[in-house]
A protein has these predicted regions:
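Rossmann-fold NAD(P)H-dependent dehydrogenase/reductase core
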Residues: 1-126
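NAD(P)H-dependent oxidoreductase Rossmann-fold/reductase module
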Residues: 69-225
Length: 225
């Protein structure tokens, strides 16, 4: 088997209308940004282990890890757009460090692409119940972001080239890496230092496996009905 690489580049933003759940009871943005990506990697591990140069890349928010709500890491009780971003970011880095520890021949890359010139913010819509002030505020934010993207945003083509570089370069060997918008390693551990010491790589992985088991059980029940 030749060179293997998994790249996930699914830009997502949390809903402004509140938590929108899948049929398994999981919040949609959480699924797209974390659970679905990790599940795909998990399912592909047997193939990746046969590759001479296995590499996994998740384009999300590497290096921007924040503290978790440690008693509610699935955000069943404390969901908010900011919490989803923070949790999926930190949990991705913890999951990749766990996977790298268990698969010492693999490279796991969690990258932050920076501000890229896409229409992701332009597609933000206010809740139907929003008042005039919130609608005007959101329109202002969309306009401001559009200007920022035009002035300092990275072209989509360059962003794609940078991610392709990460998948093919020899700079980042086996292990778990956090990569910034300049395609450089993020060295400062931030909140990860404490989480490593407290065993959160394993605790996060155990939580993730429980979520998978529950989701698969619900899916099986739906199919059998």
């Amino acid at each position: 088997m030749g060179h293997s690489a998994c790249s996930f580049q699914m830009p997502t933003l949390p809903s402004l209308t509140g938590s929108i759940d899948t049929k398994e009871g999981l919040e949609t943005c959480f699924v797209l940004s974390y659970y679905a990506r990790v599940r795909l990697v998990y399912n592909l591990l047997p193939l990746l282990r046969q590759s001479p140069r296995p590499r996994v890349l998740s384009v999300l928010n590497g290096g921007k890890e924040k503290a978790l709500h440690e008693q509610d890491i699935g955000l069943d009780q404390r969901w908010s757009p900011t919490a989803v971003i923070n949790h999926t970011t930190t949990m991705t880095s913890l999951a990749f460090e766990h996977l790298a520890k268990e698969n010492k021949e693999m490279t796991f890359l969690h990258s932050f692409p920076g501000l890229v010139r896409t229409d992701i913010f332009a597609r933000l819509e206010p809740p139907e119940s929003s008042g005039v002030v919130w609608r005007v505020t959101l329109a202002f934010i969309r306009g401001l972001v559009a200007i920022l993207m035009l002035c300092v945003g990275m072209p989509v083509e360059e962003c794609g080239e940078r991610q392709a570089f990460l998948l093919t370069t020899d700079r980042y060997g086996p292990g778990a890496w956090r990569i910034d918008a300049s395609s450089e390693q993020v060295i400062t551990p931030g909140v990860l230092e404490r989480y490593r010491e407290e065993g959160w790589r394993e605790r996060n992985w155990e939580h993730t496996m429980r979520v998978f088991d529950t989701a698969l059980a619900i899916g099986s029940e739906s199919v059998s009905k």
